[in-house]
């Protein structure tokens, strides 16, 4: 974190480093969050992969309350979609491609909102892609739970139909996947 902050001083843009939740992003042992926060980390995430271990996520959220920083989680429950490559739905079925169900995202969001509720921590949903997930965050916020989210423009502008229309281009493969319009 210190290295990134030092290099950022030479740049014309503001850089706000995000530290790892777990050591080496392995999802097993909590990283030295307090040390990274002292160095300037503004949040913590293992993005690219979810913090799958609920106990680890709970501890991270507990620490986040002391450090007053959010925990950003990539919301996919991996055991629900081990072989999926796109949204589970009519397009995936038509193309014969294993799908990733929307519930894999929604289940992880619900879990982390509950953990934020009991710890008082701030959970941030990275690149939300389901209407149900957005509703879960909206409801959590109205209940006073520290939950926020962001969405990528491609999840707003495209649906899983783009996978087929692109001729299965790798440009349409992402996590979470492009979802259906419904």
Where are these regions (language model features)?
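Metal-associated gating/positioning segment near the N- to mid-region
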Residues: 1-10, 19
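Active-site beta->alpha loop and helix N-cap motifs at the rims of alpha/beta catalytic domains
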Residues: 20-26
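Histidine/acidic residue-rich metal-binding segments in metalloenzymes
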Residues: 28-182
């Amino acid at each position: 974190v210190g290295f990134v902050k030092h290099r950022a001083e030479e740049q014309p843009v503001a850089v706000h480093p995000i530290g790892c939740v777990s050591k080496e992003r392995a999802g097993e042992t909590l990283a030295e969050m307090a040390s990274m926060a002292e160095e300037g980390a503004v949040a913590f995430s293992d993005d690219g992969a979810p913090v799958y271990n609920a106990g680890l996520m709970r501890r991270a959220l507990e620490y986040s309350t002391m450090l007053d920083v959010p925990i950003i989680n990539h919301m996919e429950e991996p055991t629900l979609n081990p072989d999926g490559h796109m949204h589970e739905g009519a397009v995936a079925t038509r193309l014969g491609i294993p799908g990733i169900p929307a519930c894999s995202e929604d289940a992880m969001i619900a879990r982390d909102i509950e953990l934020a509720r009991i710890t008082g921590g701030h959970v941030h949903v990275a690149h939300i892609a389901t209407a149900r997930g957005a509703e879960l965050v909206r409801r959590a916020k109205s209940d006073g739970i520290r939950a926020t989210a962001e969405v990528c423009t491609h999840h707003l502008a495209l649906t899983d139909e783009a996978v087929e229309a692109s001729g299965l281009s790798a440009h349409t493969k992402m996590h979470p996947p492009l979802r259906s319009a419904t």
